[in-house]
A protein has these predicted regions:
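Conserved signature/switch motifs of ABC ATPase nucleotide-binding domains
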Residues: 62-65, 83
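Catalytic Walker B motif of ABC-type/P-loop ATPase nucleotide-binding domains
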Residues: 88-91
Length: 173
């Protein structure tokens, strides 16, 4: 399924439109989803809030070529989260981010899922990230003909917090 009002996608590569500003890249998605039910001012507020959430409010008017790769990824994440989709598909969304931003956005994602009831399907390569964010982990075999290797249920209580997870005796590093 392609991106749409009920499906947000965060690609491994940011996939921003190069001729639009950071604000306009996010606003395009917000307008598509909420344009029929919200005023222009509400749409702008929602867009600005999404960019603020990912720490990009300082770059609203910059175009993708004017910001770093990690910043581009944050704008892509803001675009998907601003849509409040029922299903959020994420392909290594935090891989290009610095550790502090990654941790903050992981925590924000946990909160957004609780608030919106969204389902997240994510492809991470970081085991700790998978355990923190997931209820079930589907492990794949290696190679071009990859298949499902094992499905693991994460037995840790929700809500999950990073610090509490590290101290939980059932969590083995």
């Amino acid at each position: 399924a392609a991106p749409g009002p009920e499906r947000g996608v965060v690609f491994q590569n940011h996939s921003l439109l190069p001729w639009l500003s950071c604000f306009d890249n996010v606003h395009l998605a917000v307008e598509r989803v909420f344009g029929a039910t919200e005023t222009g001012a509400q749409l702008k507020t929602r867009t600005a809030a999404a960019l603020d959430l990912v720490g990009m409010s300082h770059a609203l008017h910059k175009r993708p070529h004017e910001i770093s790769g990690g910043m581009k990824q944050r704008v892509g994440i803001a675009r998907a989260l601003a849509m409040e989709p029922k299903v959020l598909l994420m392909d290594e969304p935090f891989g290009a981010l610095d550790a502090l931003t990654r941790a903050r956005l992981q925590d924000e994602l946990l909160g957004i899922v609780v608030r919106t009831g969204s389902t997240v399907v994510m492809v991470p390569h970081d085991v700790d990230e998978a355990v923190l964010l997931s209820d079930r982990i589907v492990m794949m075999t290696n190679g071009p003909a990859a298949t499902i290797g094992e499905i693991v249920t994460v037995p840790l209580q929700r809500p999950r917090e990073r610090v509490a997870l590290a101290e939980d005796p059932t969590y083995v590093h």
